[in-house]
């Protein structure tokens, strides 16, 4: 199985207590090599201000969000392994984990898995797309040793 090249950027005012680079690498490797051979992904961990600004600029949503995915569009005729960028907001991930009663590490893993699937072209706008994407996320999370991230919604 091929490995994903990770460019990890920690852009928080306080970077203590964040997952280790090896964890981010493990989470990426659980997703992307299943779908494509060589890949490069940037993960940028940010504070709420940067997440808010990017979410407003690119999605028209006036609030920070947990993860933003920016797939790289390779020009026709060029071969590049760059898959795209994930922007993950530390404070939103921490708040959601607490509100949802999930272990923080599991929620970080879920955000990487979820965002990676977006980079690979998956979406959850339509119900059938959401079901397919959530099924893949659940399978990957279970393989990583975490609980189904959607268990509360299914009960």
UniProtKB/Swiss-Prot annotation:
Its cofactor is Zn(2+). It comes from the Bacteria. One of its GO terms (molecular function) is RNA endonuclease activity. Binds 1 zinc ion. PROSITE patterns: UPF0054 (PS01306). InterPro entries: MetalPrtase_cat_dom_sf_prd (IPR023091), YbeY (IPR002036), YbeY_CS (IPR020549). Keywords: Cytoplasm, Endonuclease, Hydrolase, Metal-binding, Nuclease, Ribosome biogenesis, rRNA processing, Zinc. Signal peptide: none annotated. Zn(2+) binds at residues 114, 118, 124. Its EC number is 3.1.-.-. GO terms for cellular component: cytoplasm. Its main location: cytoplasm. Single strand-specific metallo-endoribonuclease involved in late-stage 70S ribosome quality control and in maturation of the 3' terminus of the 16S rRNA. Belongs to the endoribonuclease YbeY family. This is Endoribonuclease YbeY. It comes from Escherichia coli O81 (strain ED1a).
């Amino acid at each position: 199985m091929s490995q994903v090249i990770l460019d990890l950027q920690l852009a928080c005012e306080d970077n203590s207590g964040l997952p280790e680079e090896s964890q981010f690498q493990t989470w990426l490797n659980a997703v992307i090599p299943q779908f494509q051979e060589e890949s490069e992904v940037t993960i940028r961990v940010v504070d709420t201000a940067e997440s808010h600004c990017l979410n407003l600029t690119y999605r028209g949503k006036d609030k920070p969000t947990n993860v933003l995915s920016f797939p790289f569009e390779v020009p026709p005729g060029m071969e590049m392994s760059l898959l795209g960028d994930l922007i993950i907001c530390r404070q939103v991930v921490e708040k959601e984990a607490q509100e949802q009663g999930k272990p923080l590490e599991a929620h970080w893993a879920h955000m990487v898995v979820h965002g990676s699937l977006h980079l690979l072209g998956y979406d959850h706008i339509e119900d059938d797309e959401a079901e397919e994407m959530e099924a893949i996320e659940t399978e990957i999370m279970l393989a990583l040793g975490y609980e189904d991230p959607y268990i509360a919604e299914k009960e």
